[in-house]
Amino acid sequence: MQTKTLIIGNGEIGKSLFEVLDSVYECFIRGKDNTKEHFDIIHICFPYGDDFVEEVKRYQKLYTPTNTVIHSTVPVGISRKCGATHSPVRGLHPNLARSLCNFIKFVGGSDEVADYFRHAGMRVYLCRKPETTELLKLNSTETYRREIKAVQQLEKVCQKYGVPFAEVYTIATQTYNEGYSKMGYSEYHRPLLQPLQKTIDGHCVEPNHEIIEKNKIMEL
């Protein structure tokens, strides 16, 4: 399959995507010296910002792709405004190339893009709407954020009462999960996290929370 591919964004996501796709497709990462030419598919891998839609449309006009895939975390509805497919990246920083090959790759809105990723060796789950995958990613990082904050708070409460955090939370959660596994109900497992000794910085957790808050994503 000869699909001329351009990745726009040279951070961890862009570099990792290139590592996976380059062995299958004619693949480039956009640099300052890129000239105006046609690419069959462009991958948007730069962070969301106020001018995100305008930037995506500028690249679409410049490179005239048949398909545009947004891998960035964006507010619900942005991919549709761009006429793009959405496909969030999940996994462990900085080893995202390995994560791309091991996690199911959700694709929102395009059978053709789903087949493109399958041809590159990825396991794909196709959602009919890009809004589905946009909300999926926001919910994923927001859930992780809430769980981390809850564990941080519990550690402080344990210190207040002079009781061991390991017993109140770690061992209790481990044995809770073991019990449900033995009973055949692993779907009731609870996450087992360690309290961070600093603020939640990360690559995406707090920026994604800001997207949710600013755009009132979770409000009814």
What name fits each language-model region?
Residues N10, F28-D33, T85-V89, C127-P130, ...:
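Conserved beta-strand termini and adjacent loop/short-helix elements that scaffold enzyme active sites
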Residues G11-I13, T73-I78, Y144:
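Gly/Ser/Thr-rich loops at beta-strand to alpha-helix junctions
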Residues E134, R145, K149-L220:
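Interdomain hinge/lid region at the active-site interface
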